[in-house]
């Protein structure tokens, strides 16, 4: 590994590490009250204690389950609707306007109605996460299919491709970059929605951990929960980027990026 490549790998971490160092220094020097924002070392100690007791693992597992199930349901529906409206003119006429109207309703504003529908159990939280992840994947799937080069489609048809073979070998690969962008957006909305969803009478989860800590003025635990959401969001984005690297190796833009690295 050359010095330049090492620098490229470390560059994204320079600003976060500098901010943490400045944060710790401000608390140690008394420039920042621990009642407002505890030191990173105090947040780390709180996390270590929760890990040791096993409580943090429980909250992480439950939040991860809610996020994963909601993403699978919402993403699956969004992908299916995107395929229908992207591949079929009649599908677009029948579905797109209705989907767009629903998309423009803030899904977090539906919380009172969701509680009436599902109560306060897991179904309400999963429904909100699914609703938050559906539309980014739908829009990018639809956009990706509609922007496949028509000349490529006609060329494939001239070689005898049609039906599912045409979809699998030409349309889907052409739409895949846009679909994966939708996945990255959806993963961000997934954690954003979950933060609010876990305030609905939850008894476990990272959101519950933060709300419970607030009641007891445990600022270090509240900050820990916020940082956990940020870390989980970053890990999810890294996973999506890993899918891009694995599935888009053939794409000229990604080949050029890999060559530059």
Question: Can you say where each PLM-predicted feature lies in the sequence?
Answer:
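C-terminal transmembrane helix and the adjacent membrane-cytosol boundary/short C-terminal tail
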Residues: 89, 146, 177-181, 224-261
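Transmembrane alpha-helices
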Residues: 127, 131, 164-196, 220-223, ...
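Transmembrane-helix boundary motif in ABC transporter permease subunits
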Residues: 69-99
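Periplasmic/extracellular loop-to-transmembrane helix junction in inner-membrane transport proteins
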Residues: 3-5, 29-73
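N-terminal signal-anchor/first transmembrane alpha helix
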Residues: 1-27
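Generic hydrophobic transmembrane alpha-helix motif, especially the helices
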Residues: 100-136, 143-144
């Amino acid at each position: 590994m050359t010095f330049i490549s090492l620098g490229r790998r470390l560059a994204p971490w320079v600003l976060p590490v500098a901010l943490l160092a400045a944060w710790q220094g401000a608390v140690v020097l008394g420039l920042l009250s621990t009642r407002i924002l505890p030191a990173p070392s105090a947040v780390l100690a709180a996390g270590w204690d929760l890990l040791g007791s096993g409580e943090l693992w429980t909250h992480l597992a439950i939040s991860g389950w809610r996020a994963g199930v909601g993403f699978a349901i919402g993403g699956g529906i969004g992908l299916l609707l995107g395929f229908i409206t992207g591949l079929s003119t009649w599908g677009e006429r029948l579905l797109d306007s209705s989907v767009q109207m629903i998309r423009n309703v803030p899904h977090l504003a539906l919380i009172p109605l969701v509680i009436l529908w599902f109560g306060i159990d897991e179904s309400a939280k999963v429904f909100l996460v699914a609703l938050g992840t559906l539309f980014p994947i739908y829009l990018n799937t639809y956009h990706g299919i509609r922007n496949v080069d028509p000349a490529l489609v006609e060329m494939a048809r001239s070689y005898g491709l049609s039906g599912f073979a045409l979809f699998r070998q030409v349309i889907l690969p052409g739409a895949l970059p846009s679909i994966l962008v939708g996945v990255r957006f959806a993963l961000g909305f997934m954690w954003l929605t979950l933060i609010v969803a876990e305030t609905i009478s939850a008894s476990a989860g990272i959101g519950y951990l933060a709300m419970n800590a607030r009641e007891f003025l445990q600022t270090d635990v509240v900050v820990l929960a916020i940082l956990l959401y940020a870390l989980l969001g970053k890990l999810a984005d890294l996973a999506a980027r890993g899918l891009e690297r694995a599935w888009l190796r053939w794409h000229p833009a990604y080949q050029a990026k890999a060559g530059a690295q």
